[in-house]
Design a protein with these regions (language model features):
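Binuclear metal-dependent hydrolase catalytic cores
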Residues: 1-178, 188, 258-285
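Cap/insert and terminal regions of metallo-dependent hydrolase folds
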Residues: 176, 184-278
Length: 286
């Protein structure tokens, strides 16, 4: 990869649960996982089922066997692929896992509980890879060294009700990408999300619901911790970002509906695009 470039690739774009099948084949059916690669580092955001294919790809690539995984929160659709992540089963690999600080129980304990024998045959402590789990504070930063260092700012937000969510801003070679999944934005955008994303080159934003799903009927989704496509576009406009990538699509939305929602987003923020499985976006030096 050319120096100063970083690449965004989507390995899973669904929220709530995977949605495989012909009706979702164009957009993709795997749950949340985004890779951001610089010339020196592999960064992964969330570990839904998309991380399974990513893991298979990583072990085939040349380069250092090191990966950094940043978790937004611990709902199942964001961690369900971690147990099947190929690098975790190789002693050659070093896997750093980051997430929101939790004192009782700790982040490590919570992840270990998903791999007890009641739920899975291999425990966290039995994985052959060298795994380091780090809890992040509400306003934290991770520096990844290199010829051009990469910085990951972490910001805890209450935009996901009840448990909260970690937002991440990745900065490399003067460019930045913001990862803001599982946020529920009122009209004009959730204030701390908009402030955190201000001026970013790319904003990856939750866009799970239609207006009707969010507001209407006896099963409206208000308070469930996700945005409508309209909310995502309004947040991008308020933050003045370069490009909006709509993410965390509802598993009930087929390819045609996601494309229709993409068109709606563009009427509010023209530089909007629906994230699809396999989509690559390159951010290049100025």
């Amino acid at each position: 990869m050319r120096a100063g470039v970083f690449r965004i690739r989507f390995w899973g774009v669904r929220g709530s649960y995977p949605a495989p099948g012909p009706r979702t084949a164009g957009i993709g059916g795997n749950s949340s996982c985004v890779e951001i690669a610089t010339d020196e580092h592999a960064l992964v955001f969330d570990a839904g089922t998309g991380i399974i294919q990513l893991g298979r790809a990583l072990v085939q690539r040349p380069g250092k066997p090191i990966v950094h995984i940043f978790l937004s929160h611990l709902h199942h659709d964001h961690i369900e692929g971690l147990r099947f992540f190929a690098p975790a089963y190789s002693p050659e690999w070093k896997c750093y896992v980051y997430g929101a600080n939790s004192t009782a129980p700790t982040l490590k304990t919570l992840l270990a509980q998903t791999m007890t024998q009641r739920f899975f045959p291999v425990s966290l402590s039995q994985l052959p890879a060298r795994i380091s789990i780090r809890s992040l504070g509400k306003h934290d930063r991770v520096r990844l060294p290199g010829a051009q260092p990469t910085f990951v700012q972490a910001r805890f937000s209450t935009a996901h009700p009840k448990v909260g969510v970690m937002l991440y801003r990745i900065t490399h070679a003067g460019h930045s990408v913001v990862y803001a999944t599982d946020v529920e934005s009122p009209k004009g955008g959730y204030e701390d999300v908009v402030a955190f994303a201000r001026g970013a080159d790319v904003l990856i934003h939750d866009a799970q619901y239609t207006d009707e799903e969010y507001h209407g009927g006896h099963l409206n989704k208000a308070g469930w911790g996700h945005s409508t496509v309209r909310m995502a576009a309004e947040a991008a406009r308020a933050a003045g970002v370069g490009q909006l990538l709509l993410y965390h699509h509802d598993p009930e939305h087929d390819d045609a509906e996601v494309r229709q929602l993409e068109r709606l987003a563009r009427t509010i923020f023209p530089h909007s695009r629906a994230a699809t499985e396999g989509l690559e976006v390159r951010v290049t030096p100025r």
